[in-house]
Amino acid sequence: MTTAARLGIGGPVGSGKTALLECIVPLLTNQGIEVAIVTNDLLTTEDAERLKSGGILPRDRIIGVETGSCPHTAIREDPTMNILAVQDLEQLFPNLNLIMIESGGDNLASTFSYDLVDAYIFVIDVGAGDDIPRKKGPGFMQADLVVINKIDLAPYVNANLNLIRKEASVYRQSKPIAYTNCKTGVGLNEVVNFILERVLFRTALSVKNLEK
């Protein structure tokens, strides 16, 4: 049995982690990538049910884990539940290329254990304020890719997007950043190409503009 690549998706509550999955999974499957998902919630499987209802994957390729603890415990200090869920998916679907593990909503200190994932994406949204980059949380600083989501909301929440771009580049240095709007498709090509090139070691999409 071939082991699938594992990609974490983390970030604060409401930053758009589940919405990002809804947008990028179809783009990956259209490229022939065999995908499955593990979601984390404290006391429910709400995100898993949302993804199943959305039809982006067959329902049995999505597993919801009720962590019953701080969200970061299940992805860092003790990822046993998630590892078991990943193993279940690999046994059920031996041809999987990629398993995406969405953490429960957490804070800027949230990071994934590399015993659980090969790489992880940290999602924030401009609604949290334009000072997020300079707060230098471990999740933001250490993630393999940072996604700054909901960029269309910047003028409505008085967030300076130019300042976010400037400071994010300073504090992330050479680490990649994608600026996204899941409703229009802005920036999704960068996220998908990161997954293809950095996680799956495949050729990037030739289509450079995925905007709707």
UniProtKB/Swiss-Prot annotation:
Write out the annotated subcellular location. Answer: Cytoplasm
Top-level taxon: Bacteria
Record's Gene Ontology CC terms? cytoplasm
Query: Pfam families, per this entry?
Result: cobW
Q: In which broad location class does this protein mainly occur, judging by the first location in its UniProt entry?
A: cytoplasm
Q: Which GO terms describe its molecular function?
A: GTP binding; GTPase activity; nickel cation binding
Q: Which UniProt keywords apply?
A: Chaperone, Cytoplasm, GTP-binding, Nickel insertion, Nucleotide-binding
Question: What GO biological process term is on the record, naming one?
Answer: urea catabolic process
Q: Residues that bind GTP, according to the entry?
A: 11-18
The record describes the protein's role as: Facilitates the functional incorporation of the urease nickel metallocenter. This process requires GTP hydrolysis, probably effectuated by UreG.
Q: Which family does it belong to?
A: Belongs to the SIMIBI class G3E GTPase family. UreG subfamily.
Record NCBIfam families: ureG (TIGR00101)
Q: What is this protein called?
A: Urease accessory protein UreG
Q: Which gene encodes it?
A: ureG
